[in-house]
Design a protein with these regions (language model features):
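Terminal helix/beta-alpha structural elements that buttress the NAD(P)+-binding lobe
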Residues: 1-26, 33-70, 75-76, 81-314
Length: 314
């Protein structure tokens, strides 16, 4: 099968196309013939950092990146009862760990998958995996979002942000989304009640009394967001470590500032399937690249200007 491997961290030129045997599956896995996969900022950040590769893959080299996929089951482990051959499934597999999704065939834990709704494409399904799960686990699992909450979503036109906006509206929250001016209509179409152009206005001067903030941008945004959150509110950061002084500053104002790291979840990906099947959540796929264009897809994502999601079609 075709696969893309990485021997060491570096630029996109380090992504190498190879022919390797199809993976063997264990008793709790299925073999998936991949129709589409999705890439996220973690893909290029891992590709370019030996430290990140070590954190996710240990000493294994070469590695195969990728966690988000949609495709058809062509092999079943003996313990798998929830799926059958030829079922179309999707999911974020083995995150944070060794997903190996940059390949024509992938061995995936059955517990990380859901049946793909018949009314959405493989591309839409693959898009709605890591980014959807990140938004869901941040806002719902950890943020405890509820009807009437005033929610501020930074980067509302991005992969995580555009799902977060839709999720927040599903919970009947009042949603404020930040993005560039050119993506204003997209953010509002996703359900935001108010849009803030971050280039023209400091959000601190535009909003106050926020219950819940989702921050997929930077730690400095955490610091600035403290100024607009009401006592008892939450700021959720999805990019990693938070400066201790920001956590202390938030604590002094009775604000809970913390990081959330997405993880593979069968129940959550089945929630995604249900919401997509009902049309409540929609994936916005802004660009589709072929498997042979993976390097170009990484470069596009690295611009930081992608609206919605980038998908690779096989």
């Amino acid at each position: 099968m075709k696969a893309i491997i990485l021997n060491e961290a570096g630029s996109v030129s380090n992504l190498k196309y190879v022919d390797i045997p199809k993976p063997e599956i264990n008793d709790d896995e299925v073999l998936i013939k991949v129709s589409a996969l999705s890439i996220n900022p973690v893909d290029y950040k891992t590709r370019s950092s030996e430290e990140r590769i070590n954190r996710l893959f240990g000493d294994e080299r070469p590695v195969i990146l990728g966690w988000d996929l949609s495709g058809t089951i062509v092999g079943l482990g003996k313990n798998v009862s929830q799926f059958k051959l030829n079922d179309e499934v999707f999911g974020m597999i083995n995150y944070r760990g060794n997903g190996k999704a940059y390949a024509e065939y992938v061995a995936a834990p059955a517990s990380h998958l859901a049946l793909k709704p018949e009314n959405i494409s493989h591309q839409e399904a693959a898009a709605g995996t890591l980014a959807f799960l990140t938004a869901w686990q941040a806002l719902v699992t950890n943020g405890k979002i509820k009807e009437g909450d005033k929610v501020l979503i930074h980067g509302a036109s991005g992969g995580v942000g555009h799902y977060a906006t839709q999720i927040a509206k599903h919970f009947k929250a009042y949603v404020i989304g930040t993005s560039s001016e050119k993506n204003k209509e997209f953010v509002l179409q996703n359900g935001a009640d108010l849009h803030i152009d971050y280039a023209k206005a400091d959000f601190e001067n535009e909003v106050s009394d926020i219950d819940l903030v989702l921050n997929p941008i930077s730690d400095e945004i955490n610091n600035r967001s403290i100024n607009v959150v009401k006592p008892g509110g939450k700021i959720i950061y999805i990019l990693g470590e938070i400066a201790p002084e920001y956590v202390e500053k938030a604590k002094n104002k009775n604000i809970d500032l913390f990081a959330v790291f997405v993880k593979s979840s069968g129940p959550d990906i089945n929630t995604a399937a249900d919401l997509m099947q009902k049309g409540i959540i929609k994936s916005h796929v802004s660009q589709i690249f072929s498997f042979d264009e993976m390097k170009k897809a990484h470069l596009q994502l690295e611009t930081g200007r992608t609206v919605g999601k980038i998908v690779i079609a096989l």
